[in-house]
């Protein structure tokens, strides 16, 4: 062997004996109370190593330390050490409680103890006859003796030979008992690395390592030592500034797995086009006699990483309580989680397999990640090709484990079960837990969707319905009986599923499409030998798509799928007629092409659409309308021959009333040709384009049934309240006409003439009202206000001319007392009222409590402001200006549509044609605090320069500046500039050294700006500024071609971000920010004015019966006043619920 040197010479020098028997220092004595694992590592050279990790069957082993090892073992280590074969791999073990330095020799069959070491043993056993061994000089005499070997808590009792040799040898007999195993390092030198580059202007990640628990830290150290000994990682250099955090998880087997968070590194890497766009499908395989499926083990660990890129993959192993300095490592092979690892691996393996593909073009060789499928005809040829395949892989360093080599059917491949005659989806039982969450249901739906290609007829309609309204993954869903029944039916179909067939390129394919009772479209791809594959698609009724439209789009999906798998488009057999297809094609501008179709019969519930025509008929015309009045829905219609009908519907929505009006008109009309005119765009759009999947349980079903009974029906839509005569009649017919009857008593109330409104109130006795005086005039009048009405006491014009102001106010339904009238003389002379004189009036009005919506200042109408009949294409003239605007400032589509009055679809098309804006994506989502004058700040790097940017959380307004250095002084100057321009109240940053520095903290305290810090890169603390960081960089890159310096590009990018993209409510961040600041100033002025206000009022809050006040009026408008309520603070109260008065004494 490589390390057994035996001599027959009897003389041994004392110097050699001393060398063979020397003891290790006390600090390196093995800890016999601690359990660990043994690993013997042998390297072919200084960079490529072989290792012996602990045995799988022995979880406890020994730890070894070599005399010339490149890294010695330390107490507490769990795996072995890498040895450089330029020196002997030695370690210290306890033999009969005597520490001895021994040589690890994996080539020696038997362990041999030197005579010198035997004489040094603390206690020696009997001598037995030994077996002769042959050395360099001939036979060597030996004898055997019983020994006890201890290493790291492992005790072994055995016999060792004793001979006069240079060094004690531990051979395979003892190493095996200690749990040692020889493993070659998997990093191949035969494979050339691929060059990896960072994006221009980016830097590697510098994310600090987060703390790890003691258990996970031990697991990380164990895994790192194993990777280090196998040559997959190496120590990082001292000048490496990069770092990506790691974490470890425990697998089901109990072993630890080390993972690294490389998301930030992935953002900086130049990524090419995806070369693996999907999984191969067994339905596209050509039938063959013999198959072989093999797996490539540790694929990523076989391919070396670009040496120049390795520093960017650095990671850190910390210690508990900072017991020792951190240890840092870098990857030498492709790391898991790296964005380019799949691409490099697949591209490398593709190049290795390319000579085989060219040599045997008739063999089916499928490569997906580490799974390979080989199919051919003829057993000998198959075997020969398999050997060539294995050699092509092994000579490059890849491994194909024997336990994963499948040469006997059935073969497991990518979740499928393959046999020479047919294929199946690997069977699984679909189960659901007792109280499922949204995550459980989504997993179940994913399994059903996966299995639907191999098990025709699987459905998810009722299962998917249980997830409606659920947003959180851990939210409990209501598992219905329909869903359970559907699950049981699917399990029965899976249980009885038959094997599907392979593709025959000599025959044509047929796709049969059907619609289930749950309105799911299912399809199967067939040939004469049977079904190749199947699929399903839930029809999108919620998008207003008809059945024909759903199915025609399904045909394009299946055709694309078929071309992808076998390179051909099948012939389709569909359940609708040619007339229906042609009718849909007239309106279906979205169809790119139409495949060859075999028509069978009409589709379910869709024949009524053929009755709808595009031109008016010669039949009767009916104008329909629906609405709400006093909370009650009303449906009505007016016919062209003068007939009118009205129907009260109770508490329904406005849209339901419009639909019921159309239904009522169709039901009452016996004519076979009908014209229906409605002002409800909702109803017209649904009937002409949106329906088609309705059943008897759907509210639209009666309308569909009535249309079926007609010959032809024409539906038209007109805008409401535009002076169209028929629509006006229908609108009047939908109104409830009724008289308001008032019950009253008293002598001071008089009825008016029939043409006048309300009642007059009279003076009970003579009264003199001095100038600027206010008097309350009582009357004996009592009234009972009708339901949904209120009484309004107001003045008369004849009294107003004299300067008499009446502050009577509102009388609610519940008020039954006498009416009192508050009068104020605002004239220049005294006013005398005579008994019986009419001085005020009482008017009874209906009360409407409709909710009010905020006015939309940004609402865009393509019609313009000229009203009905003014539609044109005037916005076409603005397209060029909008294109120029976007080219200069990269403005968002909504802002373009608002500023240039063009349709949003046109604005989106302008944006999509921009090469810079099409690269943008959405930022990471998070939940952060948003409020006016609350800012977030962060530093970012671009073109080796530092950009400090501030983002106002409420509006998204960005302020940015360049820093010469990322230190406290430069940051403080930038904060002073920011505070001078704005009025910030609070600032949130990460824990960067420049933000937590004492000068910066003291400056923010001096400016009275609340400062908080959060975890860097955490979406719940830095979400807004991280998204702004990404947006700002993208806009800077958009302007770099037109600028000479980064400073100029930054300023242009700020204009684009703040004034060229939409924020809340469709406004730009600048508009939202200015509006907020103006509102703050307005509120301050309002409070200042309130202090000097002389107006007071009584007021009543909606929903409460008692009047409150008198209180100061903070502000009075045309329809409301603002007061400071004790319970609710500053609120607005409608004028109808207030009684204004002069400041009380």
Curated annotation (Swiss-Prot):
GO terms for molecular function: aspartic-type endopeptidase activity; DNA binding; exoribonuclease H activity; RNA stem-loop binding; RNA-directed DNA polymerase activity; RNA-DNA hybrid ribonuclease activity; zinc ion binding. Residues 13-77 are annotated as: Disordered. Specific enzymatic cleavages in vivo yield mature proteins. The keyword Cytoplasm does not apply. It catalyses: Endohydrolysis of RNA in RNA/DNA hybrids. Three different cleavage modes: 1. sequence-specific internal cleavage of RNA. Human immunodeficiency virus type 1 and Moloney murine leukemia virus enzymes prefer to cleave the RNA strand one nucleotide away from the RNA-DNA junction. 2. RNA 5'-end directed cleavage 13-19 nucleotides from the RNA end. 3. DNA 3'-end directed cleavage 15-20 nucleotides away from the primer terminus; 3'-end directed exonucleolytic cleavage of viral RNA-DNA hybrid; DNA(n) + a 2'-deoxyribonucleoside 5'-triphosphate = DNA(n+1) + diphosphate. Residues 616-739 form the RNase H type-1 domain. A zinc finger (Integrase-type) spans 877-918. Residues 100-174 form the Peptidase A2 domain. Keywords: Aspartyl protease, Cleavage on pair of basic residues, DNA integration, DNA recombination, DNA-binding, Endonuclease, Hydrolase, Metal-binding, Multifunctional enzyme, Nuclease, Nucleotidyltransferase, Protease, RNA-directed DNA polymerase, Transferase, Viral genome integration, Virus entry into host cell, Zinc, Zinc-finger. Residues 920-1077 form the Integrase catalytic domain. Residues 1095-1143 bind DNA. Zn(2+) binds at residues 886, 890, 914, 917. Transmembrane segments: none annotated. Residues 29-41, 66-76 have a biased composition (Polar residues). The keyword Zinc-finger applies. One of its GO terms (biological process) is DNA integration. It comes from the Viruses. Its EC number is 3.4.23.-, 2.7.7.49, 3.1.26.13, 3.1.13.2. Residues 45-59 have a biased composition (Basic and acidic residues). During replicative cycle of retroviruses, the reverse-transcribed viral DNA is integrated into the host chromosome by the viral integrase enzyme. RNase H activity is associated with the reverse transcriptase. Belongs to the retroviral Pol polyprotein family. This is Pol polyprotein.
């Amino acid at each position: 062997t490589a390390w057994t040197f035996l001599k027959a010479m009897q003389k041994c020098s004392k110097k050699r004996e001393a060398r063979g028997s020397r003891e290790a220092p006390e600090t390196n004595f093995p800890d016999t109370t601690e359990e660990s694992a043994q690993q013997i590592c042998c390297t072919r050279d200084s960079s490529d190593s072989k290792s012996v990790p602990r045995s799988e069957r022995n979880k406890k082993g020994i730890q070894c330390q070599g005399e010339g090892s490149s890294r010695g073992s330390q107490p507490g280590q769990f795996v072995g050490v890498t040895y450089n074969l330029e020196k002997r791999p030695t370690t210290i073990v306890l033999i009969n409680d005597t520490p001895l330095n021994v040589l690890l020799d994996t080539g020696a069959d038997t362990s041999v103890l030197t005579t010198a070491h035997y004489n040094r043993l603390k206690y020696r056993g009997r001598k037995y006859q030994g077996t002769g061994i042959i050395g360099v000089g001939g036979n060597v005499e030996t004898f055997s003796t019983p020994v006890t070997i201890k290493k790291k808590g492992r005790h072994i009792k055995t016999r060792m030979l004793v001979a006069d040799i240079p060094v004690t040898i531990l051979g395979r007999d003892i190493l095996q008992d200690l749990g040692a195993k020889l493993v070659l390092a998997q990093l191949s030198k035969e494979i050339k690395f691929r060059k990896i580059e960072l994006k221009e202007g980016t830097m590697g990640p510098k994310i600090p390592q987060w703390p790890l628990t003691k258990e996970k830290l031990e697991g990380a150290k164990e895994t790192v030592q194993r990777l280090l000994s196998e040559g997959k990682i190496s120590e990082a250099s001292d000048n490496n500034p990069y770092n990506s955090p790691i974490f470890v998880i425990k697998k089901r087997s109990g072993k630890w797995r080390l993972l690294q968070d490389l998301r930030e590194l992935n953002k900086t890497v130049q990524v090419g086009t995806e070369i693996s766009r999907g999984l191969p499908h067994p339905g596209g395989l050509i039938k063959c006699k013999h198959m072989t499926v093999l797996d490539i083990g540790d694929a990523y660990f076989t391919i070396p990483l670009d040496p120049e890129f390795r520093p960017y993959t650095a990671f850190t192993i910390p210690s508990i309580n900072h017991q020792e300095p951190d240890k840092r490592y870098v990857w030498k092979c492709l790391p898991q989680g790296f964005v380019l690892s799949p691409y490099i691996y697949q591209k490398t393996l593709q190049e290795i397999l390319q000579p085989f593909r060219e040599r045997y073009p008739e063999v089916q060789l499928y490569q997906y990640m580490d799974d390979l499928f080989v199919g051919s005809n003829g057993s000998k040829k198959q075997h020969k090709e398999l050997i060539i395949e294995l050699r092509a892989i092994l000579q490059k360093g890849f491994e194909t484990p024997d336990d994963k080599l499948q040469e006997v059917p059935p073969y497991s491949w990518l979740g499928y079960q393959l046999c020479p005659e047919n294929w199946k989806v690997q069977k699984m039982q679909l189960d659901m837990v007792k109280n499922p969450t949204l995550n459980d249901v989504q997993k179940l739906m994913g399994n059903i969707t996966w299995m639907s290609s191999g098990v025709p007829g699987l459905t998810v309609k009722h299962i998917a319905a249980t997830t409606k309204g659920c947003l959180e993954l851990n939210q409990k869903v209501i598992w219905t009986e329909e869903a359970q029944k559907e699950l049981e039916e699917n399990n029965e179909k899976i249980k009885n599923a038959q094997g599907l067939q392979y593709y025959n390129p000599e025959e044509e394919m047929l796709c049969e499409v059907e619609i289930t009772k749950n309105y799911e479209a299912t399809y199967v791809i067939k040939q004469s030998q049977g079904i190749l594959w199947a699929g399903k698609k839930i029809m999108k009724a919620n998008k207003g798509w008809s059945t024909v439209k759903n199915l025609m789009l399904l045909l394009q999906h299946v055709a694309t799928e078929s071309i992808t798998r076998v390179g051909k488009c099948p012939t389709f057999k569909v359940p609708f007629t040619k007339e229906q297809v042609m009718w849909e094609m007239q309106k279906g501008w979205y169809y790119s092409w139409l495949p060859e179709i075999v028509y069978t019969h009409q589709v379910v519930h869709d024949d009524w659409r053929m009755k709808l025509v595009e031109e008016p008929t010669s039949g009767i015309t009916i104008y329909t309308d629906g609405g709400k009045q006093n909370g009650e829905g009303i449906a009505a219609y007016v016919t062209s021959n003068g007939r009118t009908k009205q129907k009260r519907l109770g508490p329904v929505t406005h849209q339901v009333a419009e639909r019921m009006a159309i239904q009522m008109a169709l039901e009452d009309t016996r004519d076979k040709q009908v014209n229906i005119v409605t002002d409800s765009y909702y109803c017209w759009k649904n009937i002409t384009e949106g329906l088609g999947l309705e059943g008897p349980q759907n509210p639209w079903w009666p309308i569909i049934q009535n249309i079926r009974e007609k010959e032809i029906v024409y539906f038209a839509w007109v805008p409401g309240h535009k002076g169209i005569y028929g629509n006006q009649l229908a609108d009047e017919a939908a109104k409830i006409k009724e008289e308001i009857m008032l019950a009253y008593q008293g002598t001071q109330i008089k009825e008016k003439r029939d043409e006048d409104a309300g009642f007059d109130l009279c003076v009970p006795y003579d009264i003199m009202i001095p100038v600027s005086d206010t008097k309350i005039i009582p009357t004996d009048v009592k009234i009972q206000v009708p339901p949904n009405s209120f009484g309004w006491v107001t003045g008369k014009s004849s009294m107003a001319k004299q300067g008499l102001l009446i502050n009577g106010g509102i009388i609610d339904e519940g008020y039954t007392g006498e009416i009192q009238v508050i009068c104020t003389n605002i004239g220049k002379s005294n006013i005398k009222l005579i008994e019986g004189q009419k001085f005020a009036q009482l008017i009874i009005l209906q009360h409407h409590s409709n909710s009010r919506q905020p006015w939309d200042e940004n609402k865009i109408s393509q019609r313009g402001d000229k009203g009905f009949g003014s539609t044109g294409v005037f916005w076409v003239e603005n397209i060029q200006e909008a294109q120029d605007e976007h080219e200069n400032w990269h403005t968002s589509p909504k802002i373009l549509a608002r500023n240039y009055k063009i349709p949003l679809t046109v604005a989106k098309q302008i944006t999509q044609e921009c090469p810079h804006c099409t690269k943008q994506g959405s930022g990471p989502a998070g939940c952060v605090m948003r409020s006016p004058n609350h800012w977030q700040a962060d530093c970012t790097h671009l073109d080796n320069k530092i950009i400090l940017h501030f983002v106002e959380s409420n509006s998204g307004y960005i302020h940015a500046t360049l820093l010469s250095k990322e230190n406290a002084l430069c940051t403080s100057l930038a904060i002073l500039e920011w505070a001078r321009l704005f009025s910030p109240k609070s600032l949130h940053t990460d824990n960067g050294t420049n933000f937590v520095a004492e000068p910066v903290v003291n400056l923010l305290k001096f400016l009275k700006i609340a400062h908080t810090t959060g975890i860097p890169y955490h979406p719940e603390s830095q979400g807004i500024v991280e998204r702004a960081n990404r947006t700002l960089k993208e806009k800077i890159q958009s302007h770099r071609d037109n600028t000479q310096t980064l400073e100029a590009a930054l300023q242009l990018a700020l204009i684009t971000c703040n004034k060229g993209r939409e924020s809340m409510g469709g406004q730009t961040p600048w508009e939202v920010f200015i509006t907020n600041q103006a509102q703050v100033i307005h509120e301050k002025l309002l409070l200042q004015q309130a202090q000097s206000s002389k107006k007071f009022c009584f007021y009543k809050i909606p929903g409460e019966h008692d009047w409150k006040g008198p209180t100061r009026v903070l502000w009075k408008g045309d329809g409301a006043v603002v007061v400071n309520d004790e319970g609710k603070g500053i609120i607005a109260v409608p004028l109808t619920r207030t009684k204004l008065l002069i400041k009380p004494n």
